[in-house]
Amino acid sequence: MDLLADEGLVDIVPNKGAFVVNPTEDEVLQAYVLRKDLEIMAAGLAMERLTEADFLEMSNSVAEEREALFNKDLSTYLKANQSFHMIFVRKCGNKFLIEFIEKLINQTSIYLMLFDIFFEDSSPKPYGYKEHLEIIALFKQQNLNELEMCLTKHFDHAVGSLDVRNEYKELGSIFGG
């Protein structure tokens, strides 16, 4: 539990227990803005290093993501989404950038678990996997300007899908325990 607290994923409240982090709306926005900026930087560095095998791996992640959305399988969705982003991030060649982005992806995945409305019956159809296909196409075209705009739009949509509530959630309510 201390490891989760060190990673910023849970708050430990003495004599009460462990609770999933309870970020403010501003903290959530800060995490997404930083992640967007760092991923745009990584995308620029990775663009000429990506191979057809990478594009195939990214496409496979998109297929998994789409199926997980259809099946409302949040765990598989989060893994596929992280996989998609980390494929190009790892190609940037900057160890520190990779580590920072991976930490931010883990943090924003918690925010998705807490606040995303994709999996509610009334939510609109998800668009993220379609944007991922567009991102792959722009990498293949090596069109950095369009890719930066697409990534910005992608992160704006991600933030727009969140419903930030200011309340603690017990771990069991999220992890099924």
Regions found by a protein language model. Give the residues of each.
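Short linear motifs at protein or domain termini
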Residues: 1-48, 54, 96, 159, ...
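Exposed, interaction-prone assembly regions rather than primary DNA-binding/catalytic cores
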Residues: 65-85, 89
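Hydrophobic, amphipathic alpha-helical faces that serve as interaction scaffolds
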Residues: 34-49, 83-121
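C-terminal all-alpha effector/ligand-binding and dimerization domain
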Residues: 40, 61-62, 71, 83, ...
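Hydrophobic, well-structured mid-protein blocks that either form specific transmembrane helices
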Residues: 47-66, 70
